[in-house]
């Protein structure tokens, strides 16, 4: 799942644990873990908030 890959990439590049990312974003560590495992749905807005909290920028591309 794309959201899981995005969170894993952010954590790897920023060298953050799940707990550290959770603290940055105001989410619980268990929520971050569930998103990364693909067992938790996440809205685009929440994903964007997490990415921005970690200093990134979410871009969505639509190809038709």
Can you annotate each of these PLM segments?
Residues 13, 39-42:
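Helix-turn-helix/winged-helix DNA-binding modules
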Residues 45-61:
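DNA major-groove recognition helix of helix-turn-helix/homeodomain DNA-binding modules
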Residues 5-24, 49:
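Short basic helix-loop element that most often maps to the first helix and adjoining turn
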Residues 7, 27, 53-56:
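Generic alpha-helical hydrophobic packing signal
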Residues 25-40:
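Recognition helix of helix-turn-helix/homeodomain-like DNA-binding domains
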Residues 37, 62-64:
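Short, conserved catalytic or interaction motifs in soluble domains
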């Amino acid at each position: 799942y794309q959201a899981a890959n995005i969170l894993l990439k952010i954590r790897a590049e920023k060298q953050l644990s799940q707990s550290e990312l959770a603290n940055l974003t105001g989410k619980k560590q268990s929520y971050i873990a569930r998103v990364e495992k693909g067992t938790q749905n996440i809205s685009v807005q929440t994903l964007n908030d997490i990415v921005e909290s970690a200093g990134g920028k979410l871009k969505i591309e639509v190809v038709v």
